[in-house]
Swiss-Prot record:
This is Calmodulin. The gene is CAMF1. One of its GO terms (molecular function) is calcium ion binding. Ca(2+) 2 binds at D57, D59, N61, T63, E68. It comes from Fagus sylvatica (Beechnut). Transmembrane segments: none annotated.
Amino acid sequence: MADQLTDDQISEFKEAFSLFDKDGDGCITTKELGTVMRSLGQNPTEAELQDMINEVDRDGNGTIDFPEFLNLMARKMKDTDSEEELKEAFRVFDKDQNGFISAAELRHVMTNLGEKLTDEVDEMIREADVDGDGQINYEEFVKVMMAK
């Protein structure tokens, strides 16, 4: 996984890692992981951090070494690519770029894709529309897309 990173990325990660490796022993504590990742432009939730730590900290000693950290960052970078794809897809549906997909916009895109769905479009909106405002915002869109 880490072999997909560029030399520049690796040196950027090494620099960030070193900043938090206070005693220079080649390990950072799990508590510091969130700070390191945020400094690199990632924004993991507490739950995501805990999942990452559980995956990486094999011996359960509460520290993460640099090779483990690189694998973790490579995985996160891969996830970020799919996030960009989702944003792009959302923009395609959100014709007026107001941050929401209306039933009319969804119907328009589906028709252009050769789908003649009227009841189905309303049903899709109802399923995805968590806050009940009759439109799909980006968070709702991501939930629907990730559920597939």
